[in-house]
Amino acid sequence: MFTRGAPGSLVGTTLHWGAWFNDGGGFGVALVLAFGLVLLISVSLSGLAARTVLSTALMFLAAGALIGQGGFGLVDIAPTGPLVTGLADIALFTVLFTDGQRASLPALREGWRLSGRALGLAMPLTMAGIALPAHFLAGLDWPTALLLGAILSPTDPVFASAIVGRDDVPLRLRRLLNVESGLNDGLALPFVLIFLATAKGQESDLGKVGVELALGLAFGIAIPALVALAWRLKILTAEPRLQALGPLAIAIALFATCHLTHANPYLAAFIAGSTLATLDRTAAHHFEPLGDLLSELTKFGALLVFGALITPERISHLSLGDWAVAVLAILLIRPATMLLSLLRTPLPKRERSAAAWFGPKGFASVVYGLLALQAGIPAGEHVFDLVAVTIALSIVLHSSTDVPVAKALRVEPPDNLPTGARKNDDREPA
């Protein structure tokens, strides 16, 4: 449920996260144990995953499905319960704040020629392209179909890590995919909220959404800007080992401020990350390793819970038209719109094809789907189910094809990838 307003209200579009550990009738400990075990396995196999089709993201999704009611029934999680909504709320805020720090004004200017096309042309075309089959094949009305298009328009490079996470992949391709995925989460949010209010048929909600977005924008600029300017005073110096905690403190204060004032925390998070990276690149640089780890942890936790929500009962009622929407969104609509946006660009054909294919539906879509489910719109369950199967299909396809595509691009694995072999540099030869 939403933290403010009546049930189903859009007033305060954040997600309730209190007492989530006890959600699901005492299954919290089992869920945490499962997360720890899968995290240990995925870290231990991360070197192998970097070289093969093995996907750590897919591990968490599959593990969630196994422990959920569609598997062994070890956990029973409600999609609208505080566990799901709280974890999604914190995780998306963390991811957007971290992604925003990769989108400083200098970085945007440097890569804007390509990423601007992806965001300004491919993204709106993807929204509209998904809305068409959602209306004609899945039977959604136009506002709800456009809502689905907005929910599924963001991308997530975590499911294509062999492409965006390797230094030997062409920089312009990595930058294009990183900037696109870093910005489209935040850019999709206003469209999601507007179409959500329209689908509810309550025009008065549009004004409230506008106020929330405006407050989020204001806090996202003001709070990190004031802190960054204060840090320029000679008396305010941090020990090197603590410098990563400065941006984290900004994020925590911003998160609490947004929840207290009804500002939209997701837009605020992304804008704050970008503002901090623009005004204090050193602070953003020190925070990057910590931010990446926090983002990965929260994403993996959300994927585990999301996998537990995907049960046979939830997907068995989907029609052939519903499945067609998911398949078309991944195999046709995203690739076609991206290729169209990259026409007459300096990218070689192989890199354009890779950029077109790697538009995985990821974490932001999970949270936006939950927003639709909790908002009380007539087709909320239908929208969430469509989002769920599309994301699951995307994770399977994209996270298992990133390494083969990298090899097709003739990109050799870098020498510093972990192999499991022990170094003998300090030993005497036998």
List where the protein language model places each region:
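Transmembrane helical cores of multi-pass secondary ion antiporters/exchangers
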Residues: F2-A430
